[in-house]
Swiss-Prot record:
It comes from the Bacteria. GO terms for molecular function: structural constituent of ribosome. Signal peptide: none annotated. InterPro entries: Ribosomal_bL33, Ribosomal_bL33_CS, Ribosomal_bL33_sf, Ribosomal_zn-bd. This is Large ribosomal subunit protein bL33A. GO terms for cellular component: cytoplasm; ribonucleoprotein complex; ribosome. HAMAP family: Ribosomal_bL33. SUPFAM superfamilies: Zn-binding ribosomal proteins. Keywords: Ribonucleoprotein, Ribosomal protein. GO terms for biological process: translation. It comes from Geobacillus stearothermophilus. Belongs to the bacterial ribosomal protein bL33 family.
Amino acid sequence: MRVNITLACTECGERNYITSKNKRNNPERLELKKYCPRDRKVTLHRETK
């Protein structure tokens, strides 16, 4: 079952990316290093509801 999730920057809190994940394979919250246009650098982004 794939669900849509939002990735938010851990430094500024801005929600920059929307993606989907398979809850069966990844039950925990997703953490990815992505580019934040507000900070103008690569930061850690965490899954939010």
